[in-house]
Structures are given as structure tokens and as C-alpha cells.
Design a protein with these regions (language model features):
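Acidic/histidine-rich catalytic neighborhood of metal-dependent amide-processing enzymes
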Residues: 95-175, 188, 196
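Zn-dependent metallopeptidase/amidohydrolase metal-coordination segment
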Residues: 187-233
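His/Asp/Glu-rich mid-to-C-terminal helical/loop segments that flank catalytic regions of hydrolases
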Residues: 217-279
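N-terminal hydrophobic or amphipathic helices/low-complexity stretches enriched
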Residues: 1-16, 257-263, 268-269
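Cysteine-rich micro-motifs
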Residues: 296-306
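A non-catalytic alpha/beta surface segment that caps or lines the substrate-entry region
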Residues: 12, 16-58
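Active-site metal-coordination/substrate-binding segment of hydrolases
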Residues: 37, 57-119, 129
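Short functional micro-motifs and their immediate structural scaffolds
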Residues: 291-295, 308-309
């Protein structure tokens, strides 16, 4: 049912250890589960998984990444439910461990949409946490018959990211989605690197967005998921997929990379004037002093420290 979480599937996802560079456990689970539901499933050489349900002239598409930052211990993860929250425990040591809501919440949201829509596509990417490796090499032909691409890969419960170092979607898409955001308690926001950024930069040609998924304190042992917030995200995504039936074409304006002696700059963190927010809200990196945009979980482009400890 679309109005409740499938606790069995969610529990299974949360119990799986999956680390950047070793996503095979999650990939095997998703392949087996989706094939068991009668869905068309393919996997590319990178390990990315592509799922199609039903037939449509243009599909809604949901994407997620299947790696987490947490190292695989081999002990598994025991999801522990405390009221409306769930966190992780290492069953061997009985110590709290990262539940991996980033992006297991997104994986669940994709499966939730597949279960509740007559026609839908989903893609699950490897190794987002180490630079959008999977989505950066995705089969772009998979998205040619899609209307838009949604991802649930952001902490919190209210952000609808339409800009990652440049817009992810057209004004028409944002205008059409705004009433749905208002009714579900979401707002437009800027964000940091995620798979939809890589898809945009690789020319998917349609509107993309990244959405708060109900997880908090990501990348830490104390990470937890607030289940009502995850359900809130799933309801929004279903509403968008059911309501917004047109194809939302979008091609971003070309941008020039800064002249800098560096092999690779993820576009989310180009150190150029158009991608930095030089406002009083911006905070300096406490490790190197570089001024950062006021955005949770940002990677410092100078010293590559992942998160400021003051934001933990």
C-alpha cells in the first residue's frame, strides 16, 4: 500500500552491509527481489542495476545509490527500532553502527514507487560516495523514454533540491511541482553532489531532483532514520509520478571549468564564483580555511575533508 511502509522490505535493506567498492550484497538482494516481482532487470559492467516495470510512452524514473560509507565488518547490521526511529547495532559487539540511511532510504523509496505505480523505471548506482562513479558511467539510453528523474539522497525531511552547481531542471518543471511540494511540506533547495548531478552532466536531457529522505546524522555511527519522514518522501514521489505526466526536457547551459591544475573536479564543487555562496552564512572549513557554501555534508574542495566537525 502506498500509505504505509513495507516494514519487511525496509528491514531487509537496512540489514545489508554495503560499502563503496563492495556493493555486491545489496546488488544481489535488489536483483533477486526485483526479478521475483516480475520486473525486467539488467546490470551493466560497472554493477549498476536497471529496472523497468510495465509499459509506457514515457516513464517516471527513480534512482538511488547502493553503496554506503560504512566499512563492511562481516557481522551484519541489526536494525533497532526506538519509537518512530531506527538505528543500527553491530550484533557481534552490540555497539551502535551506521545504519546507512544514505542511501538505503533512497533504495527503499525506489522499490516503494515500483510497487505502487503501474509503470516505472529505477536505476541503482554503485559507488556514489566516492565520486558518483556508477552514475558517471551509466547507460544513458535507459533514460531516453523517461519524463524526469527523482532521487531520495538527502538528509532531513523537507528539501527538494533543484540546483547542484547549476539548475537540475527547467522553470516549467519547478512551476508544476511547486504545488505538490507545498502540500507535502517540502521546499526548493540547493544541494551537494549526488547521482542526479552526474546524470545531468552526462546529458540525460530531462529534469532531475534530489529529495530529503528522512535520515539524519549520515556517515556516522549515530545515524538514524525517522520512519514518518521516509514515508513522507515516498508519498511525495508517488504524487509527482502520478500527477506530472508530461516529459520535462532540460538541457543545462554550458559552463566553463575553472583553470586549475587538477585532474578532476566534481562539478558540484568547482571552485568558481558561480558555485560558491559568498554570503555571511557561508562557513570556513576549519581544516584549511576555505569558505564553503552553507550546505550540510559538503566536501571541502581545497582539502577534501568530507564534513565539518561543527556540523556533526
Amino acid at each position: 500500500m502506498s500509505n504505509v511502509l513495507n516494514s519487511s522490505i525496509l528491514h531487509s535493506i537496512l540489514s545489508i552491509e554495503s560499502e563503496s567498492g563492495d556493493c555486491s550484497r545489496m546488488a544481489d538482494f535488489l536483483t533477486t527481489y526485483c526479478q521475483g516481482q516480475g520486473l525486467a532487470v539488467t546490470q551493466d559492467d560497472m554493477g549498476n542495476i536497471y529496472v523497468t516495470k510495465g509499459a509506457a510512452a514515457a516513464f517516471p524514473c527513480i534512482v538511488a545509490h547502493i553503496d554506503t560509507v560504512h566499512a563492511i565488518t562481516g557481522d551484519g547490521i541489526l536494525p533497532v527500532y526506538i519509537g518512530d526511529n531506527v538505528t543500527g547495532i553491530n550484533p557481534a559487539t552490540m555497539e551502535q553502527t551506521g545504519i546507512g540511511g544514505d542511501d538505503k532510504c533512497g533504495i527503499y523509496a525506489a522499490l516503494h514507487c515500483l510497487a505502487n505505480l503501474p509503470a516505472c523505471k529505477a536505476a541503482f548506482f554503485v559507488d556514489e560516495e566516492i565520486g558518483c562513479i556508477g552514475s558517471g558511467a551509466a547507460d544513458m539510453s535507459f533514460f531516453r523514454d523517461c519524463r524526469f528523474i527523482l532521487q531520495a539522497d538527502r538528509r532531513g525531511n523537507a528539501d527538494f533540491v533543484t540546483d547542484i552547481s547549476g539548475p537540475l531542471s527547467s522553470d516549467r518543471f519547478q512551476r508544476d511541482v511547486k504545488p505538490l511540494l507545498t502540500s507535502h511540506g517540502f521546499r526548493f533547495s540547493h544541494g551537494a553532489m549526488s547521482d542526479v548531478m552526474a546524470l545531468r552532466d552526462n546529458g540525460c536531457g530531462i529534469a532531475c531532483a534530489n529529495i530529503s529522505a528522512g535520515y539524519y546524522q549520515p556517515h556516522q555511527a549515530c545515524e538514524y532514520i525517522h520512519l514518518p519522514d521516509l514515508l513522507k518522501t515516498c508519498r511525495l514521489m508517488l504524487d509527482i509520478c502520478r500527477t506530472m505526466s508530461r516529459v520535462y526536457r532540460f538541457t543545462p547551459a554550458k559552463r566553463s571549468r575553472p583553470s586549475r591544475k587538477r585532474d578532476f573536479w566534481p562539478s558540484s564543487f568547482w571552485p568558481s564564483s558561480d558555485s560558491w555562496d559568498w554570503t555571511p552564512k557561508a562557513k570556513p572549513c576549519e581544516f584549511c580555511g576555505q569558505l564553503l557554501r552553507d550546505d550540510d555534508g559538503i566536501i571541502c574542495a581545497e582539502c577534501e575533508t568530507f564534513e565539518l566537525s561543527s556540523r556533526l
